[in-house]
């Protein structure tokens, strides 16, 4: 039987900007996968109505982005922050009921997590403290396997949270197939040999 630790909780947020002191959430999407990246449900998308001051604080770039995506027109009809947190947490609990077991996943997820910690603390603390950040794998692939990086699926989520997070799942699925060792992976002997080689290489430097 699957447990909460077998799940990845994928979250993408749209904000009025990136300044945690003044900006607020305007959309959140949640998608749940297993560790084979199978999407377990179509996902949840919620538009949030922020304080007027946060909307007034949006710079031209962000306002144009949310206008082009159509989000700006939906914000006036959005739910409260409290309602959005409740709905998002209830959704996560369906698939990962045990607290602090399911990692948060996404792209440049540290930014989203900072906003979650401030504005949706109950959701944030339910998730494991570790993150699965696709952008980290992307940056390593760009330097170690350029062909893998440059042939990654093109992204066109249009800055809507649900489309963006599904693209992140797809992106990790691609890197898993293109950059990681194919299943069933290396043998125990191969991994032990690799570990010994790396330890020997770093022993002198680490004292």
UniProtKB/Swiss-Prot annotation:
Domain Exonuclease: 8-172
Family: Belongs to the oligoribonuclease family.
GO molecular function: 3'-5'-RNA exonuclease activity; nucleic acid binding
Protein name as catalogued: Oligoribonuclease
Gene Ontology CC terms, in alphabetical order: cytoplasm
Source organism: Leifsonia xyli subsp. xyli (strain CTCB07)
Task performed by this protein: 3'-to-5' exoribonuclease specific for small oligoribonucleotides.
UniProt enzyme class: hydrolase
Protein's cellular compartments: Cytoplasm
InterPro entries named in the record: Exonuclease_RNaseT/DNA_pol3 (IPR013520), Oligoribonuclease (IPR022894), RNaseH-like_sf (IPR012337), RNaseH_sf (IPR036397)
């Amino acid at each position: 039987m699957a447990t909460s630790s077998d799940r990845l909780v994928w979250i993408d947020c749209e904000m009025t900007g990136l300044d945690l002191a003044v900006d607020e959430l305007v959309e959140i999407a949640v998608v749940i996968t297993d560790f084979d990246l199978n999407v377990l449900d179509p996902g949840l998308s919620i538009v949030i109505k922020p304080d007027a001051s946060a909307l007034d604080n949006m710079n031209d770039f962000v306002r144009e982005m949310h206008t082009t995506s159509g989000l700006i027109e939906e914000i006036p009809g959005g739910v409260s922050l409290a309602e959005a947190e409740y709905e998002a947490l209830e959704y996560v609990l369906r698939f990962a009921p045990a607290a602090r077991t399911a990692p948060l996943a996404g792209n440049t997820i540290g930014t989203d997590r900072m906003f979650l910690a401030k504005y949706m603390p109950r959701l944030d603390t339910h998730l494991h403290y570790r993150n699965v950040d696709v952008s980290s794998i992307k940056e390593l692939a760009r330097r170690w396997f350029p062909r893998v990086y440059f042939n990654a699926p093109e992204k066109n989520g249009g800055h809507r949270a649900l489309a963006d997070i599904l693209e992140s799942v797809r992106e990790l699925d691609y890197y898993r197939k293109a950059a990681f060792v194919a299943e069933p992976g290396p043998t125990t002997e191969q991994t032990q040999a690799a570990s010994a080689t790396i330890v020997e290489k770093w022993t002198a430097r680490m004292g």
